[in-house]
Design a protein with these regions (language model features):
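A short, surface-exposed loop/turn module that caps and links secondary-structure elements
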Residues: 30-55
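Enriched for short, Lys/Arg-rich terminal
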Residues: 61-62, 66-91
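Arg/Lys-rich, positively charged N-terminal/basic patches that mediate binding to nucleic acids
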Residues: 1-27
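Conserved short hydrophobic interaction patches
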Residues: 27-30, 81
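Non-catalytic, surface-exposed connector residues within folded enzymatic/regulatory domains
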Residues: 3, 22, 36-39, 78
Length: 91
């Protein structure tokens, strides 16, 4: 799986605590190998017609992404689930 990132994602990643950044790396590698691996707890977000998904970094942090075909995805947002599930981000 090829992964692209947005400027927003990159900026948010840099603001994360180092411990969360360190947890994100192996989860991203797992996503590259198998985006539907059970430990990622992937879920499609609402509204479902936006085709936006999330997976867990840990209990509190998520990566929001969109598939761009069979072997490509773009990471849109990363952060605490209370912050990134604010649907204003998707408008």
């Amino acid at each position: 799986m090829e992964i692209l990132t947005t400027v927003t994602f990159d900026a948010l990643f840099k603001e994360l605590p180092f411990v969360v950044q360190a947890k994100a790396a192996p989860k991203t590698d797992l996503f590259k190998d198998n985006p539907f691996h059970p430990s990622l707890r992937i879920e499609k977000l609402r509204p479902k017609n936006f085709n936006i998904w999330s997976f867990r970094i840990d209990l509190h942090y998520r990566i929001i992404f969109k598939f761009l075909g069979k072997n490509k995805a773009v990471f849109l947002f990363i952060g605490h689930h209370h912050e990134i599930y604010d649907y204003d981000l998707f408008k």
